């Protein structure tokens, strides 16, 4: 049997009818209506003549109804008030709200209540909130001329000992209400009256009177639960609290929230294992309420919690409110009737206006007076949420009297409830709306309270305490820095082992000092990533006034000291003494202090970049560019003497200049240098041995005989005492960086400014209009996008076949063109029934085209004014969606995982044992059915779904899974689709492109392009995505809303035309309206397309629960306690529960009621009325339902005529088809990230101009020889920095790849090749934009016919490709971008060290030759340098750069002759160990590295999965 859409009101049992006009009497007789319906059904079975007569009668009725409806619309202004008057005496619902004594028996005398009464201050009265005519206006983010009213004439009051619930769809103004009451709104945009205990808000200390529980779970991951609570109490608690009192408060709060057993467990995050999501939500609530307050604000505190836990928490909040004298304002997403009954008042909002504010017990009666009734088994909270947005679902007046939210606002303001509210507020203009006003009230405006309960000294102390706890837990960071210190210390110490005080030793010391400096700098540079994680927590706690910015900032600086100190303590001494730096104690101490200051300077700079940048990507780019420029101008790569006057200011403002000078002065001053025989100038060649003046007569000199001379060659000519001034200079830099960081933290908050509404168009900006879409307010949509939506497009397509006996109407009958007002006039909405429909096999061929029937019909008006149904558009093509679903069976299914547990024999050791998560699960699903998997948290719902979908990557599975009677094979992915809970979608694709890509890859080649496009368009229509089909998906928070992303995710999987559809928590994070939309779509897929659907659901509403045919209910431990049908209005399972002694009451959600079967220690009513324990598992296996289900499973489940499809390949499409689709998507993805591409291009141009002008028009003097090598060396370093910037994007897209390749979209090789090939044009452009300007501005040698230029360009391009392949390899093979970026940085550092520039190859110790030859930077550097220097001749014009050689004969100096050291480019290259004949071997080596890195990337894409299930 196929279920009817729960919105169908045609079968509601009416208990009240509102007259259409004054002459018509209310119809109260249900039997008459039923007789009329039976007569109509009999008439439908008569011959054609009778049918024609009935049609004529229906036409007349419809015409009459149209006239009546028109009259009603004209009289709308008076109808609402009239209806309210007619039903003024109607009684409120006797079953809602549930009495408090029934919800919380003996709540007045339980232990918690007693503690609350004992600890409550005697003078506590709570806060009375008085809000009248409040309006808050802001400017639109995109169009500043447009003003948006987030709150519009809002009036309400709150008083102690009462809880008020706010309901409304996202964007209705709930969060703005909270921000207003929390004092977080700007007064200049606020109009109206807002009083707290009769006084205006005092922004200085208002927060001390309130507890604000936010919906985001933002905590320090390395603190335990207990430490998190204690820190919150230390910051927010009263100064008078003693240590013992704080401990008691923390223990009580943890016990209340059920966290005592986890008090010593880390909170955790994505990288640190900690408490569960539900427990984290409890921690959020706990830290918000632990300080105690006079007003409690809670924004969606139960998100992610199961119903029993939510009720447990809010029932305790109710006790705090009632007996702690604090009012509470709370918003919930999908509250149960039990939760709703805890509240005293209800506020319903829409578009910033109040649609209802009044007592909870009068709400149902109020809406019934307006013509809207809540069905008997519907949760009233869902009714309250949905009635404003979908009034036709609940109206028993047709058409509804209130059709829009403005109608409801108007009706509310004309109601008695609103008039009573205004009378109370007028009578209590002092702001205290209460019959019994307290004599003394809290007045925070009069008290001279500070902003914080504690001074900055105490705040710094507790922040320091927390910081050192975090340091002690973050042993990974310490271990990493210690390892790096020891590793690089030993590496540099042995590489520069015992450097001599000779000419080569002097130059090598400069290289060593430079590399020591960069090692410390890059170690601290990682603070950019770590500080971003801390910044989010800081923003949250700063908004809640935990501490002053200064307290946090000072503690942060102090806590950073140990890590840097430890690394310097290991690194410094090792490299200093092994490398034979100056063996003087005071110089060693200076060296160590300078390294420590360098660490702090780099740390302060990294933190500053993180504090002033909105995103981590911008911070990394900003920091890397500035860092590169400062290192370039630090005096080593480009000595001061070589820097032109136009860039010399960069030399002086670079802090690394002064670090390098300090290290150099400390090492070189007052130190004599000599020469080895081979270092004397000129060398002893036959030419130089000739007598003067032809030669030098055998005379030789040592070029540098003191450290000062060597420093002067690098432009460092400051005296020894200047090194102490360096400390002061660097201290000033540190103060400046930290000051900027401090003020950025104090005055900037990028989390608030992040646009969550930025759904951007791909095409260039058109005219922007302001709209309030279904999920997100104030979104940006172009008029072009709106025009593309056809006028007859609707969220709920009208689905009908052409058989007179069978009509499936996916719309509400109230809005359907076929709606007959006579038959439905008196439907009150009390019952939800399922309509019988013929099976697909019996339908006409046209009906056997499911998606065709979901498309809009062409309605042609007939002569009598009705619309006759025509064939759907575009039916000439074959329907590729006409297949049916598959039969899924599972028998004795078990799943277990291996875990580490304490060994009872040895408590110090862990023992491996097997944890059983699923035990002997049996069940089946047929085509056209929807199976719901339900159970409490930890029952194994998602685990079972993963096992059935074969998505588990580990664990032990036993039992049997059969699809169409056969075990799953490697081809099963062809017929199934899995909609994951986390909607991992390609952010740069549009909605339609994402669905079309899935169809192109997953549909067989027999499907033509035209058929595929039609299929995709139909899916877009079915999922109500037509209005946003050309918008980019984006990422969560900056793109489509959660509901839209969920529907797109379903569309992507539906595009494969699956026979079985698995969905994991498709309603998580959605409000009831959005959840209904999503499940409504899933229902269409199952019923109309005849697919097999298995879905896990969490707290479904009654309307959603009605969509499902079968239920598999699990209890904790993964055992079945019910598997069987639900029945009409859940009648089968409710009858089953009734036989067990469980009786449902009106307005109780059947889904919540059924879930109580899984409660541990469940007590039910026995045969004689006594209470007895229920063994749900035993009861089910002894029931008749179980026997019937097992008879079906063991019998012939699959019909004899059922045709099973067979496949001979894993993929539906060919490799080439997948490759083309992937190339197109990857290419568009890169084009649609212009920020990345443009930033890379701008960085290339900037550095090209910078380096080109730094080494502008190099000549052939002595200094130009070294400058040419420096330019080429730094250019290759820049290529490596560009590669690091590609890692985050690759890691982001890796998640999409994991999902798609697991689902069988494509071969991993097709993805890899397309990804690599589409990156080459962008690499090419980045390389060209750098090398061409640099080459010609700097004046590198172009050679004959520019041959050197083209060779150099070729080397740079393939080097860029090599670095990109290296970064890709790390991004694919390592678990996250932090580790990949770190390893990439280390790799680039080692490449720099062994590349042949810092140390020339002849100077390497023989033990390190292999490192030089393995270094991938060596080969492009050698190729480009030999290309540049071949055939070049260098001179010493006017003896510039020449070495004066005294000519001595017979002991007397007779002349001075100058020797030019570098004259031949080839000879100069030999000093670096570079050979001309290696040029083409170098090319082969570069391609070899490309092959290795790409090959490792292939292996990573194929084998590595950093996503375990």
From Swiss-Prot:
Biased segments, Low complexity type: 29-66, 813-831
In terms of InterPro entries, this protein maps to: AAA+_ATPase, ABC2_TM, ABC_transporter-like_ATP-bd, ABC_transporter-like_CS, ABCG_dom, ABCG_PDR_2, P-loop_NTPase, PDR_assoc
Which residues are involved in binding ATP 2? 935-942
Polar residues bias spans: 11-28, 839-881
GO terms (molecular function) for this protein are: ABC-type transporter activity; ATP binding; ATP hydrolysis activity; ATPase-coupled transmembrane transporter activity
Q: Where is the composition biased (Basic and acidic residues)?
A: 1-10
Output the superkingdom of the source species: Eukaryota
* Membrane topology category: Multi-pass membrane protein
Q: Which GO terms describe its cellular component?
A: membrane
Residue span, ABC transporter domain = 129-376, 888-1141
Q: Which residues bind ATP 1?
A: 168-175
The UniProt keyword set, sorted, is: ATP-binding, Membrane, Nucleotide-binding, Repeat, Transmembrane, Transmembrane helix, Transport
Q: Where is this region: Disordered?
A: 1-70, 813-881
User: What are the TM regions of this chain, as residue ranges?
Assistant: 477-497, 512-532, 557-577, 583-603, 616-636, 643-663, 725-745, 1236-1256, 1271-1291, 1320-1340, 1352-1372, 1379-1399, 1481-1501
Q: Which family does it belong to?
A: Belongs to the ABC transporter superfamily. ABCG family. PDR (TC 3.A.1.205) subfamily.
Task: Tell me what this protein is called.
Answer: ABC transporter G family member 5
Source gene?
abcG5
């Amino acid at each position: 049997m196929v279920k009817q859409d729960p919105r169908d009101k045609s079968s509601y049992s009416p208990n009240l009818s509102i007259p259409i006009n004054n002459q018509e009497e209310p119809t109260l007789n249900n039997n008459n209506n039923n007789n009329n319906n039976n007569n109509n059904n009999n008439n439908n079975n008569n011959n054609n003549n009778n049918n024609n007569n009935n049609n004529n009668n229906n036409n007349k009725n419809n015409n009459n109804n149209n006239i009546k409806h028109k009259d009603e619309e004209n009289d709308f202004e008076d109808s609402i008030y009239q209806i309210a008057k007619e039903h003024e005496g109607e009684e409120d619902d006797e079953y809602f709200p549930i009495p408090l004594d029934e919800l919380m028996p003996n709540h007045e005398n339980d232990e918690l209540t007693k503690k609350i009464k004992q600890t409550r201050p005697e003078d506590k009265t709570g806060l009375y909130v008085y809000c009248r005519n409040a309006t808050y206006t802001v400017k639109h983010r995109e169009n500043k001329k447009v003003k948006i009213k987030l709150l519009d004439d809002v009036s309400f009051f709150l008083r102690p000992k009462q809880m008020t619930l706010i309901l409304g769809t996202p964007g209705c103004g709930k969060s703005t209400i909270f921000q207003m009451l929390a004092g977080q709104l700007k007064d200049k945009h606020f109009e109206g009256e807002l009083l707290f205990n009769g006084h205006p808000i005092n922004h200085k200390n208002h927060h001390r009177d309130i507890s604000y529980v936010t919906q985001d779970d933002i905590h320090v991951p390395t603190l335990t639960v207990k430490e998190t609570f204690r820190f919150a109490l230390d910051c927010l608690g009263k100064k008078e609290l003693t240590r013992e009192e704080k401990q008691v408060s923390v223990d009580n709060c943890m016990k209340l929230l059920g966290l005592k057993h986890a008090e010593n467990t880390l909170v955790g995050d994505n990288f640190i294992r900690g408490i569960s999501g539900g427990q984290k939500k409890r921690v959020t609530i706990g830290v918000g309420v632990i300080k105690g307050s006079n007003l409690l604000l809670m924004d969606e505190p139960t998100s992610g919690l199961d119903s029993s836990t939510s009720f447990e928490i809010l029932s305790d909040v109710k006790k705090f409110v009632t007996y702690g004298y604090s009012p509470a304002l709370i918003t919930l997403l999908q509250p149960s009737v039990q939760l709703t009954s805890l509240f005293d008042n209800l506020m319903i909002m829409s578009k910033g206006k109040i649609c209802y504010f009044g007592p909870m017990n009068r709400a149902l009666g109020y809406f019934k007076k307006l013509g809207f009734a809540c069905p008997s088994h519907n949760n009233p909270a869902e009714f309250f949420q949905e009635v404003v947005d979908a009034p036709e679902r609940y109206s028993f007046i047709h058409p509804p009297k209130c059709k829009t939210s403005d109608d409801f606002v108007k009706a509310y303001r004309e109601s008695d409830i609103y008039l009573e509210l205004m009378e109370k507020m007028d009578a209590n203009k002092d702001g205290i709306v209460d019959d019994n006003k307290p004599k003394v009230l809290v007045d925070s405006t009069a008290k001279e309270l500070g902003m914080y309960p504690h001074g900055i000294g105490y705040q710094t102390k507790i922040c320091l305490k927390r910081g050192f706890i975090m340091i002690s837990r973050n042993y990974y960071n310490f271990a990493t820095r210690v390892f790096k210190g020891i590793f690089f210390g030993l590496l540099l110490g042995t590489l520069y082992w015992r450097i001599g005080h000779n000419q080569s030793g002097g130059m090598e010391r400069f290289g060593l000092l430079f590399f020591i400096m960069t090692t410390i700098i890059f170690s601290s540079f990682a603070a950019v990533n770590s500080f971003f994680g801390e910044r989010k927590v800081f923003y949250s706690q700063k908004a809640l006034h935990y501490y002053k910015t200064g307290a946090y900032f000072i503690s942060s600086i102090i806590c950073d000291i140990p890590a840097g100190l430890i690394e310097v303590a290991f690194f410094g001494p090792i490299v200093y003494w092994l490398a034979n730096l100056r063996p003087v104690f005071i110089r060693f101490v200076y060296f160590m202090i300078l390294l420590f200051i360098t660490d702090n300077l780099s740390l302060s700079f990294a933190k500053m970049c993180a504090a002033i940048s909105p995103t981590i990507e911008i911070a990394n780019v900003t920091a890397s560019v500035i860092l590169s420029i400062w290192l370039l101008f630090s005096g080593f790569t480009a000595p001061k003497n070589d820097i032109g006057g136009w860039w010399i200011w960069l030399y002086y403002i670079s802090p690394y200049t002064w670090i390098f000078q300090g290290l150099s002065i400390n090492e070189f001053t007052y130190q004599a240098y000599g020469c080895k025989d081979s270092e004397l100038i000129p060398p002893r060649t036959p030419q130089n041995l000739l007598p003067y003046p032809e030669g030098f007569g055998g005379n030789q000199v040592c070029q540098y005989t003191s450290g000062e001379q060597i420093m002067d060659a690098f432009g460092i000519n400051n005296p020894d005492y200047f090194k102490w001034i360096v400390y002061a200079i660097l201290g000033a830099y540190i103060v400046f960086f930290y000051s900027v960081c401090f003020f950025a933290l104090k005055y900037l908050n990028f989390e608030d400014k992040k646009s969550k509404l930025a759904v951007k168009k791909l095409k260039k900006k058109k005219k922007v209009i302001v709209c309030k879409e279904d999920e997100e307010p104030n979104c940006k949509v172009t008029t072009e996008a709106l025009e593309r939506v056809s006028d007859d497009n609707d969220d709920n397509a009208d689905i009908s076949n052409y058989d007179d006996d069978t009509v499936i109407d996916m719309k509400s009958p109230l809005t359907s063109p076929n709606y007959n007002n006579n038959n439905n006039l008196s439907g009150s909405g009390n019952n939800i029934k399922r309509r019988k429909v013929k099976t697909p096999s019996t339908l006409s061929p046209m009906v056997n085209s499911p998606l065709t029937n979901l498309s809009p019909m062409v309605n042609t008006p007939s002569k009598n004014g009705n619309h006759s149904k025509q064939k759907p558009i575009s039916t000439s093509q074959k329907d590729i969606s006409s297949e049916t679903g598959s039969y899924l069976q599972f028998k004795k299914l078990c799943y277990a995982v291996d875990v580490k547990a304490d060994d009872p024999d040895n408590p110090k050791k862990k023992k491996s044992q097997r944890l059983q998560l699923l035990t002997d699960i049996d069940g089946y699903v047929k085509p056209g059915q929807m199976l719901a998997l339900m159970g409490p948290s930890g029952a194994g719902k998602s685990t079972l779904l993963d096992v059935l979908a074969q998505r588990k990557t580990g664990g032990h599975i036993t039992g049997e899974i059969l699809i169409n009677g056969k075990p799953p094979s490697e081809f099963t992915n062809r017929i199934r689709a899995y909609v994951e809970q986390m909607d991992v979608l390609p952010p740069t694709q549009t909605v339609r492109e994402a669905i079309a890509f899935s169809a192109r890859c997953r549909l067989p080649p027999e499907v033509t392009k035209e058929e595929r496009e039609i299929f995709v368009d139909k899916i877009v229509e079915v999922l109500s995505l037509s209005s946003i089909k050309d918008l980019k998906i984006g990422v969560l928070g900056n793109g489509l809303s959660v509901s839209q992303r969920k529907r797109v995710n379903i569309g992507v999987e539906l595009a494969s035309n699956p026979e079985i559809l698995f969905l994991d928590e498709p309603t998580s994070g959605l409000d009831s309206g959005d959840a209904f939309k999503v499940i409504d779509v899933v229902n269409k897929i199952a019923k109309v397309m005849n697919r097999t659907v298995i879905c896990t659901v969490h707290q479904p509403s009654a309307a959603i629960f009605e969509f499902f045919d079968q239920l598999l209910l699990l209890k904790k431990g993964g055992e079945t306690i019910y598997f069987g049908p639900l029945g009409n209005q859940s009648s089968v399972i409710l009858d089953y529960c009734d036989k067990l002694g469980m009786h449902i009451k009106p307005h109780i959600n059947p889904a919540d009621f059924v879930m109580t079967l899984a409660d541990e220690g469940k007590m039910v009513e026995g045969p004689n009325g006594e209470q007895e324990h229920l063994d749900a598992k035993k009861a089910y296996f002894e029931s008749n339902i179980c026997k019937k289900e097992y008879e079906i499973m063991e019998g012939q489940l699959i019909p004899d005529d059922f045709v099973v499809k067979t496949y001979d390949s894993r993929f539906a499409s060919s490799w080439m088809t997948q490759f083309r689709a992937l190339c197109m998507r990857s290419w568009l993805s890169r084009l649609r990230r212009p920020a990345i591409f443009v930033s890379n291009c701008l960085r290339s141009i900037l550095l090209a101009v910078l380096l080109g002008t730094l080494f502008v028009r190099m000549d052939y003097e002595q200094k130009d020889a070294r400058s040419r090598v420096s330019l080429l060396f730094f250019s290759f370093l820049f290529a490596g920095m560009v590669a690091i910037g590609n890692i985050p994007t690759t890691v982001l897209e890796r998640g999409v790849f994991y999902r798609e390749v697991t689902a069988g979209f494509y071969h991993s090789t097709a993805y890899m090749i397309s990804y690599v090939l589409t990156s080459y044009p962008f690499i090419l452009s980045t390389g060209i934009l750098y090398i061409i300007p640099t080459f010609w501005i700097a004046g590198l040698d172009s050679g004959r016919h520019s041959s050197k230029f083209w060779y150099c360009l070729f080397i740079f391009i393939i080097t860029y490709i090599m670095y990109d392949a290296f970064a890709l390899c790390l991004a694919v093979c390592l678990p996250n971008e932090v580790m990949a970026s770190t390893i990439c940085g280390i790799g680039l550092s080692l490449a720099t060290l062994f590349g042949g520039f810092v140390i020339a190859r002849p100077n390497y110790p023989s033990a390190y030759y292999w490192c030089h030859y393995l270094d991938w930077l060596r080969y492009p550097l050698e190729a480009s340098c030999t290309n540049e220097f071949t055939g070049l001749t260098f001179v010493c014009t006017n003896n510039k750069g020449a070495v004066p050689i005294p000519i001595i004969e017979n002991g007397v100096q007779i002349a001075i002759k100058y020797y030019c050291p570098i004259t031949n480019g080839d000879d100069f290259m030999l000093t670096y160990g570079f050979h001309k004949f290696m040029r083409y071997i170098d090319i082969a080596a570069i391609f070899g590295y490309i092959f290795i890195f790409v090959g490792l990337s292939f292996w990573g894409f194929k084998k590595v999965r950093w996503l375990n299930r």
